[in-house]
């Protein structure tokens, strides 16, 4: 290989190394260190220092986080990723939250770079609310607090980053997700409540369940209670793995067949919200890796009405301790999905995508 060819190869490798961080910062505008430290694959410290040193990224600010420079946006355009340069804002905290969700999706292999409902309706990806608000003639969100939308088959989840003190116009949020679902031809809707951890997201909901404030203006807890689905997401690598599995079409069926018995007979047994019967305990079980609080509650009601003494929640290993706190024994039991079924599920999804 000639010297010129080697130089081009080195430049290509450098560009590929820079690209995830540059695209994510350019897209989200402000990303804080709390987020970047949780995703070192994209934002390792040596890379960030290099980007600052070469004038692509501004020095880190506790107030505004990581931001691209004019040269940074120019670099993206040169590499066929043109983006609107940053406009100064005092709402950087909200941008930090938006970025945490977008980066988690990116780490899960879900593109957060959708910019219109039309584009989003054709692909099962993630549509950030900030991209919709920035688009011309796309003011479909108004003053809604939604962070973004993700399609999982026929289900549309509206992502929110809840705060206990933040008030929600309940019907307006419901109307928003229903309207987007109709435009995307989704038949089911729900919410994805995001936070730095499962605990922080759940605490915001719990506060709202305790302190009701009215019919129109409510809390995130009320929003969750009125939903068909209320999933929790931790904005880190664990949450990214959760989303990666949730995105696999009909993932519950193959897992149910690998983990238990009678997976095709739940409706006849009066347990339509359950997934299978545990072969050892002979009790109904539900796959809970999606952390769907509403689904778990429905399954619990059905199991009790059918006369069972337990409902088994089968989840990922890092979800177990949290689930044990909010769904305690003796009625609830928490099981862990072994690595082998997870591996087979991922292998099947990889083959199907080829």
What are these regions (language model features)?
Residues 48-83:
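Accessory beta->alpha helical hairpin/"wing" motif in late/C-terminal subdomains of nucleic-acid enzymes
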Residues 37-46:
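Short, basic interhelical loop/turn and adjoining N-cap
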Residues 103-354:
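Electrostatic, structured charged patches in enzyme active sites and in nucleic-acid/phosphate-binding
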Residues 83-117:
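Amphipathic alpha-helical dimerization/coiled-coil segments
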Residues 43, 92-97, 165-173:
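Short amphipathic alpha-helical segments
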Residues 1-10, 82-85:
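Short, Lys/Arg-enriched N-terminal segment that forms or immediately precedes the first helix
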Residues 5-38:
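Short amphipathic alpha-helical interface segments
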Residues 14-15, 69, 166-170:
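Ser/Thr-centered flexible coil motifs
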């Amino acid at each position: 290989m000639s010297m010129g060819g080697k130089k081009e190869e080195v430049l290509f490798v450098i560009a590929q190394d820079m690209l995830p961080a540059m695209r994510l910062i350019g897209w989200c505008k402000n990303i804080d260190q709390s987020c970047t430290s949780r995703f070192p694959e994209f934002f390792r410290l040596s890379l960030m220092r290099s980007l600052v040193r070469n004038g692509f990224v501004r020095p880190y600010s506790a107030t505004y986080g990581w931001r691209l420079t004019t040269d940074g946006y120019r670099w993206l355009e040169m590499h066929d990723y043109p983006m609107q340069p940053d406009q100064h804002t005092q709402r950087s905290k909200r941008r930090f939250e938006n970025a945490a969700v977008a980066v988690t999706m990116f780490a899960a292999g879900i593109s957060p770079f959708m910019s219109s409902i039309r584009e989003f309706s054709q692909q099962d990806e993630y549509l950030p609310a900030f991209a919709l608000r920035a688009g011309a003639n796309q003011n479909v969100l108004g003053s809604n607090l939604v962070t973004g939308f993700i399609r999982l088959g026929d289900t549309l989840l509206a992502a929110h980053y809840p705060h206990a003190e933040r008030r929600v116009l309940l019907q307006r949020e419901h109307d928003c997700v229903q309207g987007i679902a109709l435009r995307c031809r989704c038949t089911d809707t729900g919410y994805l409540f995001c936070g730095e951890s499962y605990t922080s997201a759940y605490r915001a909901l719990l506060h709202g369940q305790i302190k009701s404030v009215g019919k129109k203006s409510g809390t995130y807890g009320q929003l969750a209670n009125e939903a068909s689905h209320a999933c929790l997401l931790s904005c880190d690598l664990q949450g990214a793995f959760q989303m990666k599995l949730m995105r696999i079409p009909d993932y519950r069926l193959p897992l149910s067949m690998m983990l238990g018995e009678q997976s095709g007979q739940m409706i006849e047994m009066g347990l339509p919200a359950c997934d299978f019967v545990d072969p050892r305990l002979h009790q109904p079980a539900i796959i809970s890796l999606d952390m769907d609080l509403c689904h778990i509650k429905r399954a619990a009601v059905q199991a009790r009405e059918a006369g069972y003494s337990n409902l088994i929640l089968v989840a990922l290993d890092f979800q177990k301790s949290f689930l044990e706190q909010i769904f305690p024994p003796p009625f609830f039991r928490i099981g862990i999905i072994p690595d082998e079924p997870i591996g087979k599920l991922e292998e099947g999804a990889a083959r199907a995508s080829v």
